[in-house]
A protein has these predicted regions:
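Gly-rich Lys/Arg/Thr-decorated short loops/hinges at beta-loop-alpha junctions or inter-strand turns
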Residues: 1-2, 17, 48-56, 65-78, ...
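Short Gly/Thr/Asp-enriched flexible loops that form oxyanion-binding sites at enzyme active sites
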Residues: 115-128
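Gly/Ser/Thr-rich loops at beta-strand to alpha-helix junctions
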Residues: 58-63, 109-117, 152-154
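Glycine-rich oxoanion-binding loops at beta->alpha junctions
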Residues: 61, 68-101, 138-140
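Core alpha/beta catalytic barrel or barrel-like domain that forms the active/cofactor pocket
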Residues: 65-66, 108, 130-141
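Structural motif
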Residues: 50-53, 81, 102-106, 129-132
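N-terminal amphipathic/basic leader segments beginning at the initiator methionine
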Residues: 1-53
Length: 154
């Protein structure tokens, strides 16, 4: 079987993918501490500061999670390395950056590394009112007797 990939280099695929996404979305900006955030302030319909929403996860499925940064969706996204959770520093920095005094919601997949690092980040950003929504409905591997079994589920 011939496998091919749509990338410049396996060494730069993540930075290339994120650069392409940012070039195509003027409301997105890369922050060197490791997250993509909106460039326009998040506001409610009344013009007041809004609750920020942050997510993240391992790279390799671009534009997942950064592709959800935008109006009415994520305020920031923290991409981890290839199939690796984002680290707690990335998430903590994104949390503190995104907070406008109304708090932050972390949308976290129920994957061990994501849960652990988002929890550590929440504790590190203790000045920010942070709540967590745990997503635990992945059934991609359900019924596959030869595979590792279900992942990311409670």
């Amino acid at each position: 079987m011939n496998h091919s990939a749509f990338r410049n280099s396996q060494d730069t695929f993540l930075s290339d993918a994120l650069a392409g996404l940012i070039a195509n979305h003027p409301d997105a900006r890369w922050h060197d501490v490791g997250f993509i955030g909106r460039t326009t302030p998040l506001r409610t319909a009344d013009g007041d500061p809004a609750v920020a929403v942050i997510s993240g996860g391992g790279s390799g499925h671009e534009p997942m999670h950064a592709g959800f940064v935008g109006q009415g969706m994520l305020t920031a996204a923290c991409p981890g390395l290839l199939f690796t959770s984002p680290n707690a520093v990335q998430v903590s920095e994104a949390t503190q950056w995104a907070d406008q005094g109304r708090g932050v919601v972390h949308v976290v997949k129920n994957y061990t590394g994501d849960v652990m690092n988002f929890t550590v980040a929440r504790n590190a950003a203790e000045a920010v009112d942070t709540r967590t929504v745990l997503v635990a409905d992945d059934i991609a591997t359900d019924g596959n007797e030869d595979g590792p079994g279900r992942r990311g589920t409670g």
